[in-house]
From Swiss-Prot:
Substrate binds at R113, G114, G115, E116, Y117, T118, Y119, H120, A193, I194, G195, G206, I207, A208. GO terms for biological process: protein modification process. The gene is lipB. Belongs to the LipB family. Its EC number is 2.3.1.181. Keywords: Acyltransferase, Cytoplasm, Transferase. It holds the Pfam family LplA-B_cat. Pathway: Protein modification; protein lipoylation via endogenous pathway; protein N(6)-(lipoyl)lysine from octanoyl-[acyl-carrier-protein]: step 1/2. GO terms for molecular function: lipoyl(octanoyl) transferase activity. One of its GO terms (cellular component) is cytoplasm. It is an enzyme of class 2 (transferase). The record marks K190 as: Lowers pKa of active site Cys. Residues 74-262 form the BPL/LPL catalytic domain. This is Octanoyltransferase.
Length: 264
């Protein structure tokens, strides 16, 4: 993995929004963010789709743009869309060009989501989350923390303790078996990334959980601008899980955090 210093960034740099951000008094109390349920008891369930094979990234962007517009207009339901992509890098709105170490390795897409550079590829479960926050809570920080909670509960199904960090969006796994860092702190690896965008309080983009990707592909970037911590996956942690196993766990955890879903 690349080495270097961690650049300081706002704790919610993974957000890109043109919706007003409501100040929250709960910012330092993530436990309050554990649930992000619809306000109406009879709210329709969230549509849940799983794509087969590898999904072209530009096609995924076009689909999300159209769906977000339809959700805003009230002609489509909220949606969570699970996909895998061919190998590629994406750059968020905070990406530093110096963090793209090998620009010719894979296709690079500039995207409107928050955050910096990340990798997508086979063996990684990407969940695109298109929810109307007006139906839930107009609180961006609460939404991001709820996405983290969703990942944490998914990992718990495999007895993995995922942790959030105030200064680093995403979910992390402590690696006590690895050498400590130069400052004596415990090694931590990132197992899941978050990068979202809001358009008039409808979210898109989402989360990415490493199930069994080729972790060497992260070597072409400084993932999320963080160089002293590495990346890991469920299989890298010694778990013989499949993408199907993760999808089941994601579904159950989603209902716990966000409410009912409708599968096909």
């Amino acid at each position: 993995m690349p080495t270097g210093k961690l650049r300081q960034k706002p704790p919610y740099a993974a957000i890109m929004t043109n919706s007003p951000v409501t100040p929250s008094t709960e910012t330092q109390q993530p436990k309050r963010y554990a649930r992000f349920l619809p306000q109406e008891a009879d709210a329709p369930p969230v549509e849940w789709l799983i794509a087969e094979g590898l999904t072209d990234y530009e096609e995924a962007l076009a689909f999300m743009e159209a769906r977000v517009q339809a959700i805003r207009e009230g002609t489509a339901s909220e949606l969570v869309w699970l996909v895998e992509h061919p190998p590629l890098y994406t750059a968020g709105t905070s990406a530093n060009a110096e963090d793209l170490l090998t620009p010719d390795r894979f296709p690079v897409f500039n995207t409107g989501r928050g955050g910096e550079y990340t990798y997508h590829g086979p063996g990684q479960r990407v969940a695109y989350v298109m929810l109307d926050l007006k139906r839930r809570r107009e609180d961006v920080r609460a939404f991001v923390a709820s996405l983290e909670q969703w990942i944490i509960e998914t990992l718990a199904a495999f007895n993995i303790k995922g942790e959030r960090r105030e200064d680093r969006v995403g979910v992390w796994v402590v690696r006590p078996e690895k050498p400590r860092l130069a400052d004596g702190s415990m090694c931590e690896d990132k197992i899941a990334a978050i990068g979202i965008r809001l358009r008039r309080w409808v979210s898109f983009h989402g989360i990415a959980i490493n199930v069994e990707p080729d972790l060497s592909h992260y070597g072409g970037i400084v993932p999320c601008g963080i160089s002293e911590h590495g990346v890991t996956s469920l299989v890298d942690l010694g778990l013989p899980v499949t993408m199907g196993d993760v999808d089941v766990a994601l579904g159950k955890a989603f209902e716990s955090v966000f409410g009912p879903r409708q599968t096909k």
